[in-house]
C-alpha cells in the first residue's frame, strides 16, 4: 500500500509538473489564438476554394506561407521590442492599411468598379502569386480580429510576464497556433469535399458556375465590410474632430512633472490673467530636467493672444511672471509640423475615455497609469517578480548601476541567496533569544533584590538629535516610535525664516542640491537676452537675497562676505529699477565666486553638474474641455468663445423669462442693445427621460469602442453594460428574489396581535391605492411625452397640429356652438344669451407654454418651439351651458358638476385631438354634456307633477271617508265630552291648591340653597305614558283617576328623595376650580349657571302670586279649554281629536306638577345632555386607556387581588364620586391645548377663549367652596393634566413635558410604615415588576388617590413602594422578556407590534448590526420619546431580602466585542428625589420642527437624529454596543439612609453628542468624590481632545434658563463639527413639485401690469406656496431646515481609528467562537499592572478572554517582556525557521495541545487557548495595521483588499500554522482576508 501510494503520488506530481510546464501552457494559449478569426482568413479561404490547377496550387501554398509568416511575425513582436513598437503603434498600422486597401480595390476593379469577372486578368498576371502572399502577410499584421474578440490573442502577451523562459513559451505558443490552424484548414477541406460530392450541388452545373463567378465579388464585399469596421474602430485622421488646445507646453506637450519630495516649497504666485500655479516660483524649488524651457499659457486679453511667461527670478536668474503681448504669432505653419503630427494627433481622444476633471491640475489627467510595476525582488531568499514594486526604487537602482563603477554585476544563484537569507534569519533569531534569556535573568535578579521591575524591562529606543544636550525628536517625528505617537509630518519652508537653527536643519537635509542648481542657470543666460530690461520687486528681492547670504554663511562654515545686507541697498526706497541683465549676472557670479572657494582659493566647481531627481510623471491631456452645461451657463470665461467638446446628456433649455419681451409697449432702450450680454434669459435645463447614449464621451472619439450597452425597457433612463446588470436595482418583473416579501409577511405575522391593529387600515390602504394610481398615471404621462420627444419629426408635426387645433377651437368651433345654441333658444321661445356666451368666450385665453408647461406670453412662442416642443394652455376654458341664470330660475336645483373642478383648476391643456387635459400629456377629462342638465330638469319637473296629482287624489278620498264617519257619531261624541269635562271641573274645585303648591315651594327652597346641581348626572327624564283610549266605556270611573294620581305622587316622592340625597352629599363640600376675581366679564360657563338660578328666583316670587290666584287661574284655564274644544270639534277629524286629547292628558299632568322644580329639572336635563355629549369622547378615551393598559397577566400573583385587574372605568367612577373631580373640568383640560393655538377658532367668542385659556375655574367666586384638597388630589390632577392633550385614537398614557412624576409621588410615600415583613405581605412587588413602566406609575397614582385614607396592610390597598424610605419605583431589569435593547423596559409606546416588547436580544445573539426595521413605528403619531429614555435604574428594591453584591443587567452573552468604551466608576446615593432623568441626545425636548428625511423610514421624527447618527458611522455602533456601560460603585455609609453596596450598571445609549448633562452633575460628583473617593477610569478609543470634550459635557450641569441652554447648544454644535465636518444638504423630495409649481406661477406673474392683484388671487387659490417663498434676503440655514426646505444628512466618513479600535473591528467580527462572555464581567478587574506581584500582571489585550475568577488571565508568555517590535520579529523568525521548512515550527507556544501544561487550563478551555495562540501569533495588542504592512511589503500587494490566501502559498510554513490554529479554534479560513478588508 505504501509503495502504491508512493507511485501514485509521483504520478500526480509528474502530471502537475507537465501541465504547469512552459511548453504545455504555450501550446494551450497558442491553440486558443486560432479561434480569433480575422480578415486574413478570407484570403486564405479564397485561395483554397477558388483556385484550381497548377496555378491554384501555387496560390494555395503562397497564401498559407504568407499567413503563417505573418502570424510568426506577430509572435516574434511579442518578444522583440522594436518590432512590437513598429507593429503596435496605431499610426503605423493605419499607414500600412489605407494605401494597401486602395491598391487592392483598384487591382481587382481596374476596368469597372464593382464589376467582377472570373476570366478577366490584368497585365500584371505574373505577380499574382506574390500578391496573394502579400495579402495574407499584411492582413495578418493588421491585427484586426472579428470573432469572438481580440482578447484571445492578448492572452499570449499577458502570460509572457509570468514565465521565465520566454523564447520557449513563444515557440510553443506558435506551435500550438500552427496545430490549431492545420486542424482548421483540414476542417475546411472536408467541407469542400462534402460540397463537391453532394449530388444535388453537382447535378446543378449552372449553380456551380454562378457560385464560382460571384465568389470574388462576395470576398471583396466581405473584405470591404471588415475594413470599414476596422476604420470605424480607429477613425481616420482627416474626418475626426480637432480639439482646440488651450495650452501649448514647451516642456512636454502631454505630460507634466509632479515632483515627489518630502517638503512643499514655495508659494503660489497668482498673477493677473493666470490660472495655473507656477511650477517653479521660489528660490529652492525642484529643478526641471531642461531649465531652458519656459512655460507659456495662452489667455485672451482684449481679443489679442496674451502669453504669460515665467522667467527665472533673481537668485535663479529669473524674474517674476509678467504679461507680454506678442506682436507675432508663434503658431507653426502646417508644413513646418511633422507629417505624423498632421495625420495622427496622439493627444486626441482616440478612445472613448471620459474627461476626468481634477481640481489640483488645470488639465485632465490621462487615465492610463497602471498600478502595477513589475520588477524582481528578493523574498524568502529567492528572487521573485513583484508586480507592485515601487517605480522610484527601480529607477534609483538603475541609476546606481550606471553611475557606480564598483557595483558588482555578478548574480548570485538562488541557493546562495536562500542560504544567506536563512543564515541571517537564524542569527537574528539567536540574538533575540539570547536577549530574551538575559532579560529573564535580570528579572529574576530584580525580584530577588526587590528592585523595580520596570527598570529591567526593555525600553523603547528614541532618536536623539543632540547628544550633548540629550534632546530627542518629538514623538510625532520619531521614526522608532509607532502607533498613536506617530503622525503625519507636514514640513513647510518659508522664505521669511531667518533662524539659524532652522537653517541648519534644512542644510542637513540636502540644500546643497539646490545650490548646485544655481550653476545650471548661469550657462543659459544667453537665451533671455532678447529682453534686456526686467522689472524687479524690491521687497521680494531683498528678502530672498538676505536669506541667500545667510544660507551661504552657514554652508561655508564662516562668514565669507563682509556685506551687511541690512545696509546694502540694491534698489532705492519705494521705486522700481530696471537693471541690465549683464550687471545682474556679474553680481551674482561675484557672490558665487566669493563663497564657493576653498582656503587654497581653488574653485570647487567650475562647470554645472546636472543632478537627476526621481520624479513621477503624470500624463495630462493638453486640452481643457467643457460640456454643454458649462457652455450654457457660461461661467468659465474661456468657455465663452469655444464650443462644448463633451457630449453630455441630451437636454433642453426651458425658457422662463425673456428680457426682450418685458416691455410690452414696444419701447426699447438704446442702452439695452449695448448690454445684451448682461441681460441673459432666465431658463431651466430639462433632461429627457430617455437612454443616454452620449455618456459624456468627447467629440471625435471612437464611439464604436465603447462598452456594449443594452436597453430592455421602452423608456430607460440609463444605458447599462451587460456585465453590470446584476448590480443595478431590478425591476419588479425581473426580480427573482422571492424570499424578501415572504420574509416581511412572516415578520408581520409573527409580531402582530389583534389588540394592536391599526384602526385606519382601510383608509391607509385606500390612500396607498390612490398614490399608486397617481404614480401610474404620471408614468404613463411621462412615457407619452418621451415618445413625442424621441421621434425625429414628431415635435414639428405636433406643434403645428396644436396651433391649428387652438385656432379651430377659438375661432370656429366655439363661435359656431354659441350660434347654434342661441338659435335653438329662439326656436323654443326663450330669450337668447348672446351677451353671456360671448363674455365667457372672450374670457377663454390660449397661452403658449414650453414643453414642460411653463407658460409664456399670450402671443409669444417659445424659442425653438418646433424642435423642443410646445404646449397650449387654455385659461378659463369655455363651457357651453343651456342657461346662465340657473340659480334664480331653477331654485338651485341645477348644480354644475364642473363647478368644483373649475374652482380648483380653471385651466387645462390642449391635446392634439382637440381634447382637454389637466396636465400635459395627461388623459383627456370628461366633457360636460350640454343636454344633461336639461334632461335632469325635465325629470325633476315630471316627478313633482306626479306627486301633486297623487296627493290631491289621496286627500280627497280620505276626507270623504272622514266626513262620513264623523257625521254619524258627532252628536253622541259631543255629549260624552261635555259630561267628562264637568266631572273634571268638580274634582279640581274640591282640591286645596295651597297645599299642593306649598310642598313644591319647600322643595324648591332646598334646591336653591345648594346652587351647584349643574354638573350632576341625574337620570330623571320625563316618562311619557301612552295615551288613553278615549272611546273606552270605563273612562268615567273614579278608581282609574285615583290610580293615576297615586302613580304620579309616587314618582314625585322618589324624585324628591333623590334630590335630597344629592343635596346632602353636596353639603359636605366638593372641589370647585377657581375663577379669576379680577375679571370684569363673567365667563361663559358662569352665565350658563346664572340663567337657571335667576329662573328659580323668579319662579319663587311668582309662586306666592299663583297661590292666591290659583282658583281664578284654574277656572279661567278650564273655560278657555271648553271654548277651544267646541271651536275645534267642528273642524277637525277624529284623528286630530285623539291627538288633542293626548295633549290634554299631558297638560293635566303638567298642571298637577305646577312647580318651578320641574322647570329646574328640565333645565338640568338639558344641561346634562350637553355634558353627556361632550363626555362621550372622554368615555371613549377612557375605553382606549382601559384597552391599552389592561390584558396584563401576572403569573407570579399569589393572592386573588391584582390591581391590574381593576377596570379603569371603575377608577374614573370612583374619581367622579369623590370630591374635587368632575368631568367638565377634565374635558376643559383636554381642550386647553386646542385653544392655545393662535391660528384656529378665530371666530369664537371672547368669553369662551377666556374660559379655556384663563385659570381653571368653573363656578362663580361666590359659589366657590373653601375646602382645600389634600396632596393626593393635586397629585392626581397634575398627572391627568399631562394626558388630555393627546389626540391619539389608541394612545397610551405617556407623560408630557414638565412633569416629573417620580419626584412627585415620592412625597406621598409614607416613610413611617417600615414593616420588615412588607416583602411577604406585598405580593404586588413581584407582580408589578413585569408591568410596563408608564402603567405602573399610573396605577400607583390612581390607587393612591382613591384609597389614600386606607393605607393599611390589606393586600389590595397596600402600595408596593410605600414601605422603603428613600426608595424609587422598582423595575425588574433582569426579566426574561423581549425588550427593545433591554433598555425600554416595556414602556408603553403606542405603535408596538407586540404586547411585550420588540427584540429578544438574549435569544438572538447573532445580530451584528443595528437593524432599524425593529423600530416599526408610525410617522403619523408623534410620541414623547422621554418615556422610554428615562433610565431610572435600581437593583433589588427590597433591602431585607437576600442582597446580591453585583446586580448587573445581563443583556446578552456577547462574544468579546465591548472593549473600547468608557467606564465611569462613581459612588452615588440611592435617593430617588435627587436622581435626574438621563437625557439622551436632547430627546426630552419635543422636536416639533424636525424634518423627516425619508418618509419610508418606519419610525418617529424623533428617531431621525438616532438614524443620522447611525448613518454616520454604522460600523462604529453595532447592535449590542449602542449601550454605553456606566459602572457606578455605591458604597455603604451612614446610619439613617442605608445604602446598598455593589456596582449598579447603567446601560445608556452612546450618543455622538455625548449629552450626559442631566445625569451627571458637577456639584454632585465633586461632593461624592470628596466623601467616598471616586475612581474614574476611561478606557476608550477617543482621542485626547474628544475625551476632554466628553468629560466637560458629562460633568456640566444643565440649567433651565435660556441663556445656558443656548450656550450648551452652541458647544454641542461645535463639538459635532469637530468630529463630523462632512454633511450634505439636500432638497426635500416633496418640495420638488411645489417648487416647480411656484416657478410656473412666477413665470406668469413676471409680465402683468396689475401684479399685486393677480399675486393675491393666486395666493388665495393656493397656487403659490408662501412657505417656499424666500422673502428674506439672507436666509439662515436653521430656518431653511425648520421650514423643511433643506435637510442635513451626513456623509459617510473615512474615520481614522487607533490600533485598539482596528483590533476590535477585525477580531470582534471574525472570531466568532464558542466561549462567549457577558458584558457584566468586562470591567471588573482593578488595574493593568500590579507592581508588587509580577504574577498578577495583566496585559491590556488579554481582557478579551481572561478568566476572571482567577488572576491567571492568559497563557503566560515570556515574549511579552520584549518590546512589541522585537517580539514581532522573534515570532516571524520562528515561524520561518529554515531548519523546519517541512514541519511544524519548534515553538513552545505553537506546539500541540498535549505539550502545553499549565495549571490554568482544562479541557473546556481548548478553544480559548487556541484563540490565545492565534492572538500571540498575529501581533501583540492585535495591532493589525502591522499585519497590513506585512501584507504590503511581504506579499507584494499595494492594496490590502487584494490580499488572499493564495499568496500565502509562497510561505508554506506560515500557511500550515495558520490552518492548524484556525481549524482548532473553529474560525473560518478566510479570516485574514476578512480582517484586512475591515482595516
Swiss-Prot record:
The keyword Signal does not apply. GO terms for cellular component: chloroplast inner membrane. It is a multi-pass membrane protein. InterPro entries: TIC214 (IPR008896). The keyword Membrane applies. One of its GO terms (biological process) is protein transport. The chain crosses the membrane at residues 18-38, 67-87, 90-110, 127-147, 175-195, 218-238. It comes from the Eukaryota. Keywords: Chloroplast, Membrane, Plastid, Plastid inner membrane, Protein transport, Transmembrane, Transmembrane helix, Transport. Residues 243-291 are annotated as: Disordered. Part of the Tic complex. Belongs to the TIC214 family. Involved in protein precursor import into chloroplasts. May be part of an intermediate translocation complex acting as a protein-conducting channel at the inner envelope. This is Protein TIC 214. It comes from Morus indica (Mulberry). The gene is TIC214.
Amino acid at each position: 500500500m505504501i509503495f502504491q501510494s508512493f507511485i501514485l503520488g509521483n504520478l500526480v506530481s509528474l502530471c502537475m509538473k507537465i501541465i504547469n510546464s512552459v511548453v504545455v501552457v504555450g501550446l494551450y494559449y497558442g491553440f486558443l489564438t486560432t479561434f480569433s478569426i480575422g480578415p486574413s482568413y478570407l484570403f486564405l479561404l479564397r485561395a483554397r476554394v477558388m483556385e484550381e490547377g497548377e496555378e491554384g496550387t501555387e496560390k494555395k501554398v503562397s497564401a498559407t506561407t504568407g499567413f503563417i509568416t505573418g502570424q510568426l511575425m506577430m509572435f516574434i513582436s511579442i518578444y522583440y521590442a522594436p518590432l512590437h513598437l513598429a507593429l503596435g503603434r496605431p499610426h503605423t498600422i493605419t499607414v500600412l492599411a489605407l494605401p494597401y486597401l486602395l491598391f487592392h480595390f483598384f487591382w481587382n476593379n481596374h476596368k469597372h468598379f464593382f464589376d467582377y469577372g472570373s476570366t478577366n486578368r490584368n497585365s500584371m498576371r505574373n505577380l499574382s502569386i506574390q500578391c496573394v502572399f502579400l495579402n495574407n502577410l499584411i492582413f495578418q499584421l493588421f491585427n484586426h480580429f472579428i470573432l469572438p474578440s481580440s482578447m484571445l490573442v492578448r492572452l499570449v502577451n499577458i502570460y509572457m510576464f509570468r514565465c521565465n523562459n520566454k523564447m520557449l513559451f513563444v515557440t510553443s505558443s506558435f506551435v500550438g497556433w500552427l496545430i490549431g490552424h492545420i486542424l482548421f484548414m483540414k476542417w475546411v477541406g472536408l467541407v469542400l469535399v462534402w460540397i463537391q460530392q453532394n449530388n444535388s450541388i453537382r447535378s446543378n452545373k449552372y449553380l456551380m458556375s454562378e457560385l464560382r463567378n460571384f465568389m470574388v465579388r462576395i470576398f471583396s464585399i466581405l473584405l470591404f465590410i471588415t475594413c470599414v469596421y476596422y476604420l470605424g474602430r480607429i477613425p481616420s485622421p482627416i474626418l475626426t474632430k480637432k480639439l482646440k488646445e488651450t495650452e501649448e507646453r514647451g516642456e512636454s506637450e502631454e505630460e507634466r512633472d509632479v515632483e515627489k519630495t518630502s517638503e512643499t516649497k514655495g508659494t503660489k504666485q497668482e498673477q493677473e490673467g493666470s490660472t495655473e500655479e507656477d511650477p517653479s516660483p521660489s528660490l529652492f524649488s525642484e529643478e526641471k530636467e531642461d531649465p531652458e524651457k519656459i512655460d507659456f499659457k495662452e489667455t485672451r486679453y482684449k481679443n489679442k493672444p496674451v502669453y504669460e511667461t515665467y522667467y527665472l527670478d533673481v537668485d535663479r536668474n529669473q524674474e517674476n511672471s509678467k504679461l507680454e503681448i506678442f506682436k507675432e504669432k508663434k503658431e507653426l505653419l502646417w508644413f513646418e509640423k511633422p507629417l505624423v503630427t498632421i495625420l495622427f494627433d496622439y493627444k486626441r481622444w482616440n478612445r472613448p475615455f471620459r474627461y476626468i476633471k481634477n481640481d489640483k491640475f488645470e488639465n485632465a489627467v490621462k487615465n492610463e497609469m497602471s498600478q502595477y510595476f513589475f520588477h524582481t525582488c528578493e523574498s524568502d531568499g529567492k528572487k521573485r517578480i513583484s508586480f507592485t514594486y515601487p517605480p522610484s526604487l527601480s529607477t534609483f537602482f538603475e541609476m546606481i548601476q550606471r553611475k557606480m563603477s564598483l557595483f558588482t554585476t555578478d548574480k548570485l544563484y538562488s541557493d546562495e541567496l536562500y542560504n544567506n537569507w536563512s543564515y541571517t534569519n537564524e542569527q537574528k533569531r539567536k540574538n533575540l533569544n539570547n536577549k530574551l534569556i538575559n532579560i529573564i535573568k535580570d528579572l529574576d535578579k530584580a525580584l530577588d533584590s526587590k528592585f523595580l521591575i520596570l527598570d529591567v524591562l526593555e525600553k523603547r529606543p528614541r532618536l536623539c538629535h543632540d547628544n550633548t544636550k540629550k534632546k530627542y525628536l518629538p514623538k510625532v517625528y520619531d521614526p522608532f516610535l509607532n502607533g498613536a505617537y506617530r503622525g503625519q509630518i507636514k514640513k513647510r519652508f518659508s522664505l521669511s525664516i531667518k533662524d539659524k537653527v532652522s537653517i541648519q536643519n534644512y542644510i542637513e537635509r540636502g540644500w546643497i542640491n539646490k545650490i548646485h542648481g544655481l550653476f545650471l542657470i548661469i550657462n543659459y543666460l544667453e537665451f533671455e537676452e532678447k529682453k534686456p530690461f526686467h522689472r524687479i520687486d524690491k521687497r521680494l528681492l531683498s528678502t530672498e537675497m538676505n536669506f541667500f547670504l545667510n544660507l551661504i554663511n552657514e554652508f561655508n562654515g564662516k562668514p565669507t562676505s563682509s556685506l551687511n545686507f541690512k545696509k546694502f541697498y540694491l534698489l532705492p526706497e519705494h521705486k522700481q529699477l530696471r537693471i541690465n541683465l549683464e550687471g545682474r549676472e556679474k553680481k551674482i557670479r561675484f557672490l558665487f565666486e566669493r563663497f564657493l572657494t576653498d582656503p587654497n582659493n581653488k574653485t570647487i566647481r567650475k562647470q554645472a553638474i546636472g543632478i537627476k531627481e526621481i520624479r513621477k510623471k503624470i500624463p495630462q491631456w493638453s486640452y481643457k474641455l467643457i460640456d454643454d452645461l458649462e457652455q450654457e451657463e457660461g461661467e468659465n470665461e474661456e468657455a465663452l468663445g469655444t464650443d462644448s467638446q463633451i457630449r453630455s446628456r441630451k437636454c433642453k433649455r426651458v425658457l422662463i423669462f425673456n428680457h426682450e419681451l418685458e416691455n410690452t409697449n414696444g419701447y426699447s432702450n438704446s442702452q439695452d442693445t449695448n448690454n445684451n450680454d448682461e441681460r441673459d434669459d432666465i431658463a431651466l435645463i430639462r433632461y429627457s427621460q430617455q437612454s443616454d447614449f452620449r455618456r459624456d464621451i468627447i467629440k471625435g472619439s471612437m464611439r464604436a469602442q465603447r462598452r456594449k450597452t443594452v436597453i430592455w425597457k421602452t423608456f430607460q433612463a440609463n444605458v447599462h453594460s451587460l456585465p453590470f446588470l446584476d448590480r443595478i436595482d431590478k425591476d419588479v418583473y425581473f426580480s427573482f428574489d422571492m424570499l424578501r416579501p415572504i420574509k416581511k409577511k412572516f415578520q408581520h405575522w409573527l409580531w402582530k396581535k389583534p389588540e394592536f391593529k391599526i384602526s385606519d387600515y382601510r383608509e391607509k390602504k385606500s390612500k396607498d391605492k390612490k398614490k399608486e394610481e397617481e404614480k401610474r398615471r404620471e408614468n404613463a404621462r411621462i412615457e407619452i411625452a418621451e415618445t413625442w420627444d424621441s421621434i425625429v419629426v414628431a415635435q414639428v408635426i405636433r406643434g403645428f397640429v396644436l396651433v391649428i387645433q387652438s385656432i379651430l377651437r377659438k375661432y370656429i368651433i366655439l363661435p359656431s356652438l354659441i350660434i347654434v345654441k342661441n338659435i335653438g333658444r329662439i326656436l323654443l321661445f326663450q330669450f337668447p344669451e348672446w351677451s353671456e356666451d360671448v363674455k365667457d368666450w372672450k374670457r377663454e385665453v390660449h397661452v403658449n407654454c414650453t414643453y414642460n408647461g411653463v407658460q409664456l406670453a399670450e402671443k409669444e412662442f417659445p424659442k425653438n418651439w418646433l424642435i423642443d416642443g410646445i404646449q397650449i394652455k387654455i385659461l378659463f376654458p369655455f363651457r357651453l351651458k343651456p342657461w346662465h341664470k340657473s340659480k334664480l330660475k331653477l331654485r338651485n336645483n341645477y348644480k354644475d358638476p364642473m363647478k368644483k373642478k373649475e374652482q380648483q383648476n380653471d385651466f387645462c391643456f390642449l391635446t392634439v385631438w382637440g381634447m382637454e387635459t389637466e396636465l400635459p400629456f395627461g388623459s383627456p377629462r370628461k366633457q360636460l354634456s350640454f343636454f344633461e342638465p336639461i334632461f335632469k330638469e325635465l325629470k325633476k319637473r315630471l316627478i313633482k307633477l306626479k306627486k301633486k296629482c297623487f296627493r290631491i287624489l289621496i286627500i280627497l278620498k280620505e276626507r270623504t271617508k272622514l266626513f262620513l264617519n264623523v257625521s254619524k257619531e258627532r252628536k253622541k261624541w259631543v255629549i260624552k265630552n261635555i259630561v267628562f269635562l264637568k266631572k273634571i271641573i268638580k274634582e279640581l274645585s274640591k282640591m286645596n291648591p295651597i297645599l299642593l303648591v306649598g310642598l313644591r315651594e319647600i322643595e324648591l327652597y332646598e334646591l336653591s340653597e345648594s346652587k351647584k346641581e349643574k354638573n350632576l348626572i341625574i337620570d330623571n327624564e320625563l316618562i311619557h305614558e301612552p295615551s288613553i283610549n278615549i272611546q273606552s266605556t270605563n273612562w268615567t270611573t273614579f278608581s282609574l283617576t285615583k290610580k293615576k294620581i297615586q302613580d304620579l305622587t309616587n314618582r314625585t316622592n322618589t324624585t324628591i328623595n333623590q334630590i335630597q340625597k344629592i343635596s346632602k352629599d353636596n353639603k359636605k363640600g366638593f372641589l370647585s376650580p377657581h375663577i379669576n376675581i379680577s375679571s370684569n366679564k363673567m365667563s361663559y360657563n358662569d352665565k350658563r349657571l346664572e340663567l337657571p338660578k335667576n329662573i328659580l328666583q323668579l319662579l319663587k316670587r311668582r309662586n306666592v302670586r299663583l297661590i292666591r290666584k290659583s282658583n281664578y287661574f284654574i277656572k279661567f284655564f278650564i273655560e278657555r279649554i271648553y271654548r277651544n274644544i267646541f271651536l275645534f270639534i267642528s273642524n277637525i277629524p277624529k284623528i286630530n281629536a285623539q291627538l288633542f286629547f293626548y295633549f290634554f292628558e299631558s297638560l293635566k299632568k303638567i298642571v298637577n306638577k305646577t312647580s318651578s322644580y320641574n322647570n329646574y329639572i328640565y333645565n338640568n336635563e338639558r344641561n346634562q345632555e350637553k355634558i353627556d355629549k361632550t363626555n362621550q369622547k372622554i368615555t371613549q378615551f377612557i375605553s382606549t386607556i382601559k384597552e391599552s393598559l389592561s390584558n396584563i397577566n401576572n403569573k407570579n400573583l399569589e393572592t386573588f387581588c391584582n390591581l391590574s385587574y381593576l377596570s379603569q372605568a371603575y377608577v374614573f367612577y370612583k374619581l367622579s364620586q369623590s370630591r374635587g373631580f368632575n368631568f367638565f373640568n377634565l374635558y376643559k383640560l383636554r381642550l386647553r391645548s386646542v385653544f392655545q393655538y393662535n391660528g384656529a377658532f378665530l371666530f369664537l367668542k371672547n368669553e369662551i377663549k377666556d374660559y379655556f385659556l384663563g385659570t381653571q375655574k368653573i363656578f362663580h367666586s361666590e359659589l366657590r367652596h373653601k375646602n382645600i384638597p389634600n396632596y393626593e388630589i393635586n397629585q392626581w390632577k397634575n398627572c391627568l393634566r399631562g394626558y388630555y392633550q393627546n389626540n391619539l385614537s389608541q394612545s397610551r398614557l405617556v407623560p408630557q413635558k414638565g412633569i416629573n412624576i417620580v419626584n412627585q409621588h415620592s412625597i406621598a410615600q409614607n416613610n413611617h410604615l417600615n414593616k420588615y415583613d412588607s416583602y411577604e405581605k406585598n405580593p404586588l412587588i413581584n407582580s408589578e415588576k413585569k408591568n410596563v413602566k408608564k402603567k405602573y406609575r399610573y396605577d400607583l397614582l390612581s390607587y393612591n388617590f382613591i384609597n389614600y385614607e386606607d393605607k393599611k396592610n390589606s393586600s389590595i390597598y397596600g402600595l408596593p413602594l410605600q414601605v422603603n424610605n428613600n426608595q424609587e419605583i422598582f423595575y425588574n431589569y433582569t426579566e426574561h422578556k423581549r425588550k427593545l435593547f433591554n433598555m425600554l423596559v416595556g414602556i408603553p409606546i403606542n405603535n408596538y407590534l407586540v404586547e411585550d416588547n420588540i427584540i429578544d436580544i438574549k435569544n438572538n445573539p447573532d445580530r451584528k448590526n443595528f437593524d432599524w426595521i425593529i423600530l416599526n413605528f408610525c410617522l403619523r403619531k408623534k410620541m414623547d420619546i422621554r418615556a422610554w429614555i428615562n433610565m431610572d435604574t435600581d437593583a433589588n428594591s427590597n433591602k431585607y431580602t437576600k442582597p446580591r453584591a453585583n446586580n448587573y443587567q445581563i443583556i446578552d452573552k456577547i462574544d468579546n466585542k465591548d472593549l473600547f468604551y468608557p467606564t465611569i466608576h462613581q459612588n452615588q446615593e440611592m435617593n430617588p428625589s435627587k436622581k435626574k432623568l438621563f437625557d439622551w441626545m436632547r430627546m426630552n425636548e419635543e422636536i416639533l420642527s424636525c424634518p423627516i428625511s425619508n418618509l419610508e423610514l418606519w419610525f418617529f421624527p424623533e428617531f431621525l437624529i438616532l438614524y443620522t447618527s447611525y448613518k454616520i458611522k454604522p460600523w462604529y455602533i453595532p447592535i449590542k454596543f449602542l449601550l454605553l456601560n456606566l459602572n457606578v460603585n455605591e458604597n455603604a455609609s451612614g446610619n439613617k439612609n442605608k445604602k446598598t453596596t455593589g456596582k449598579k450598571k447603567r446601560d445608556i445609549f452612546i450618543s455622538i453628542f455625548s449629552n450626559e448633562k442631566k445625569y451627571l452633575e458637577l456639584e454632585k460628583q465633586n461632593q461624592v468624590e470628596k466623601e467616598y473617593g471616586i475612581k474614574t477610569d476611561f478606557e476608550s478609543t477617543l482621542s485626547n481632545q474628544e475625551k476632554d470634550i466628553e468629560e466637560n459635557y458629562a460633568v456640566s450641569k444643565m440649567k433651565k434658563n435660556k441663556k445656558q441652554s443656548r450656550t450648551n447648544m452652541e458647544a454641542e454644535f461645535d463639538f459635532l463639527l469637530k468630529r463630523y465636518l462632512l454633511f450634505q444638504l439636500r432638497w426635500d423630495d416633496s418640495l420638488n413639485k411645489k417648487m416647480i409649481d411656484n416657478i410656473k406661477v412666477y413665470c406668469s406673474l413676471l409680465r402683468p401690469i396689475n401684479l399685486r392683484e393677480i399675486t393675491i388671487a393666486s395666493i388665495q387659490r393656493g397656487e403659490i406656496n408662501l412657505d417656499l417663498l424666500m422673502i428674506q434676503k439672507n436666509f439662515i440655514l436653521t430656518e431653511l431646515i425648520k421650514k423643511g426646505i433643506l435637510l442635513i444628512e451626513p456623509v459617510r466618513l473615512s474615520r481614522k481609528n487607533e490600533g485598539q479600535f482596528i483590533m476590535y473591528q477585525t477580531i470582534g467580527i471574525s472570531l466568532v467562537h464558542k466561549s462567549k462572555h457577558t458584558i457584566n464581567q468586562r470591567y471588573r478587574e482593578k488595574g493593568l499592572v500590579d507592581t508588587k506581584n509580577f504574577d498578577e500582571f495583566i496585559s491590556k489585550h488579554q481582557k478579551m478572554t481572561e478568566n476572571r475568577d482567577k488572576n491567571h488571565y492568559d497563557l503566560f508568555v515570556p515574549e511579552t517582556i520584549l518590546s512589541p517590535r522585537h517580539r514581532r520579529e522573534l515570532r516571524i523568525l520562528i515561524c520561518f525557521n529554515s531548519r523546519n521548512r517541512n514541519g511544524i515550527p519548534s515553538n513552545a507556544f505553537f506546539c500541540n495541545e498535549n505539550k502545553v501544561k499549565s495549571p490554568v487550563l482544562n479541557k473546556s478551555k481548548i478553544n480559548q487557548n487556541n484563540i490565545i495562540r492565534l492572538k500571540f501569533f498575529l501581533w501583540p495588542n492585535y495591532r493589525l495595521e502591522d499585519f497590513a504592512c506585512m501584507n504590503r511589503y511581504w506579499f507584494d500587494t499595494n492594496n490590502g483588499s487584494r490580499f488572499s490566501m493564495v499568496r500565502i502559498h509562497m510561505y508554506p510554513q506560515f500557511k500550515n500554522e495558520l490552518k492548524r490554529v484556525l481549524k482548532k479554534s473553529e474560525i473560518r479560513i478566510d479570516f485574514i482576508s476578512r480582517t484586512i478588508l475591515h482595516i
